[in-house]
């Protein structure tokens, strides 16, 4: 079997060295982590910053009404607790990288909540603002908005379901139960089912002049989209466009069709919103997308060394926000990227590590559980297994045409279609055997990994059919393959501890190893947010 060289942390770690003792079976931990004076003060300053963002949301137009009207708003009281889980065991540069990235992710979600409540007919009821908004799926690359600086894309499903489930593990269960009472089967993807449930029980904000829905991440989303679109069009008078991305996106023949559909979508938005597409704005956005891709690959090159710096759940969430929610439209992201890049280079130079030792180098493949996304940092601190990158962060590698010339416009439509087809997760789970299986082993080689952790989402049919192929090819290559089951956003099927137990069992029985921090192996966080 392939083995990785064990890397030892030569720096003396200040503060707490055992982290499981911080959990006491309550909603939050019994105290926050002590990191030494300097890092604790820095960490506390970011804690205060998070509260300032949440207070600003509450005080914004419609904020107080939103807290009372929508059940999902209460989940955001747990934001500081969630960020604490992402920074477990971190010191120096790794702590600052994580906070820099998550500060902006939280700020971006907070802006989404502010805009959503401001335009919502039930809370802020700002009609003028609402008429400048286009509703978009949370799972869409918002490329069709890259040339519309006059109007806003509102991803209302992000605060309602996606990010809420990261904050509190039981945030989606009510919506799942509502959907199943309505007659939707319980063995479908819980993400789309929860979105349908939120629509059924009127827990989505209502705003916007029109809406664009997509069939990404998978065709399972069509189930929820049908219910949501019906309510938007028939009850709220919000027309909806269906932007269909071909499933076999690796086939070059489908690009022309996808580009034509993108043209129709843009023309439809122009018609409904009364605005014109601006090519100058589009090419500014695509330059930022290209810069994001270059920066991401430089971070991954550092992760290919013995001293990776930017990895784990925050790496994934930052890429989600940067590519999908933003897609080059925000001018604020490049300076954040630059700041992270400086910290990554500095951390690599200083050989900064998160744990006392790194025993294994792991690629994380498949779709992670929203309610246990912090498991990647648990792996580092409990078992010394470094999650170098995850499937959802492997979005695109190519760069797109940046030159604003009329002869490049047709290519630009194809570039937008390519981005839409290759949105996060979908670019691997759909498109054929090559992009899901073969590319995994390419990343294993490029990042010098000796282990793969395969998330097995029970309700997802895309990966489950290739279970045997992954097993066989991992065996041929001498790669340790760990299967970990979950149900995406329903912790009642697989609890957090059940998820951790699967990984721990492999490390003990197959790898014959003992944990770095035994207090983390069994954590009483069943009731924790």
Pin down the residues of each PLM region.
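Redox- and metal-dependent alpha/beta enzyme cores, enriched for Fe-S-associated oxidoreductases
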Residues: 129, 138-177, 363-432, 436-440, ...
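Hydrophobic alpha/beta core scaffold segments
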Residues: 375-389, 404-424, 432-522
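Active-site and donor-binding regions of nucleotide-sugar-utilizing enzymes
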Residues: 161-249, 255-257, 483-485
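An N-terminal, globular interaction/scaffold subdomain
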Residues: 99-204, 225
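Extended, charge-rich low-complexity interaction segments
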Residues: 187-205, 267-288, 415-437, 510-529
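Gly/Ser/Thr-rich loops at beta-strand to alpha-helix junctions
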Residues: 134-143, 215-223, 365-372, 458-465
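A charged, amphipathic alpha-helical module
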Residues: 10-11, 20-27, 34-133, 259, ...
């Amino acid at each position: 079997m392939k083995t990785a060289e064990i890397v030892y942390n030569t720096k003396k770690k200040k503060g707490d060295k055992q982290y499981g003792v911080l959990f006491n079976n309550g909603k939050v931990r019994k105290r926050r982590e002590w990191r030494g004076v300097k890092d604790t003060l820095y960490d506390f300053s970011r804690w205060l910053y998070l509260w300032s963002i949440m207070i600003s949301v509450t005080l914004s137009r419609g904020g107080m009404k939103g807290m009372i009207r929508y059940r999902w708003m209460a989940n955001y009281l747990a934001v500081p607790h969630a960020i604490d889980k992402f920074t477990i065991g971190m010191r120096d540069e790794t702590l600052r990288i994580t906070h820099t990235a998550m500060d902006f992710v939280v700020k971006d979600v907070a802006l989404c909540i502010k805009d959503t409540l401001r335009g919502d007919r039930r809370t802020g009821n700002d009609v003028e603002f609402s008429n400048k908004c286009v509703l978009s799926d949370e799972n869409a690359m918002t490329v069709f908005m890259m040339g519309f600086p006059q109007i806003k894309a509102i991803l209302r499903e992000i605060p309602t379901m996606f990010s809420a489930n990261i904050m509190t593990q039981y945030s989606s269960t009510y919506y799942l139960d509502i959907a199943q009472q309505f007659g939707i089967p319980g063995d479908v993807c819980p993400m789309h089912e929860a979105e349908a449930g939120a629509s059924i029980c009127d827990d989505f904000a209502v705003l916007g002049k029109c809406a664009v829905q997509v069939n990404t991440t998978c065709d399972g989303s069509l189930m929820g989209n049908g219910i949501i679109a019906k309510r938007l069009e028939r009850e709220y008078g919000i027309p909806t466009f269906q932007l269909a991305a071909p499933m076999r996106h690796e086939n070059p023949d489908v690009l022309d069709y996808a580009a034509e559909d993108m043209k129709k979508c843009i023309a439809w938005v122009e018609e409904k919103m009364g605005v014109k597409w601006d090519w100058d704005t589009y090419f500014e956005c695509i330059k930022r997308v290209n810069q994001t891709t270059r920066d991401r690959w430089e971070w991954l090159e550092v992760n290919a060394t013995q001293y990776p710096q930017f990895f784990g759940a925050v790496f994934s969430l930052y890429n989600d926000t940067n590519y999908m929610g933003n897609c080059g439209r925000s001018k604020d992201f490049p300076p954040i990227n630059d700041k992270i890049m400086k910290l990554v280079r500095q951390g690599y130079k200083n050989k900064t590590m998160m744990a006392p030792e790194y025993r294994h180098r792991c690629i994380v493949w498949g779709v992670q559980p929203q309610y246990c996304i912090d498991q990647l940092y648990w792996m580092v601190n409990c078992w010394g297994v470094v999650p170098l990158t995850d499937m959802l962060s492997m979005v695109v590698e190519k760069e797109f045409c940046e030159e604003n010339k009329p002869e490049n416009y047709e290519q630009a439509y194809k570039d937008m279609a390519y981005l839409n087809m290759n949105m996060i997760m979908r670019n691997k789970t759909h498109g054929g055997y090559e992009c899901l299986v073969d590319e995994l082993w390419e990343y294993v080689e490029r990042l010098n990994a000796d282990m793969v952790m395969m998330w097995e989402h029970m309700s997802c049919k895309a990966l489950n059919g290739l279970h045997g192929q992954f097993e066989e090819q991992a065996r041929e290559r001498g790669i340790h393959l760990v299967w970990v089951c979950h149900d995406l956003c329903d912790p009642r099927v697989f609890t957090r501890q059940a998820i951790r137990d699967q990984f721990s069992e492999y490390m003990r029985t197959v790898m014959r190893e003992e944990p770095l921090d035994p207090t983390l192996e069994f954590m009483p966080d069943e009731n924790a947010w």
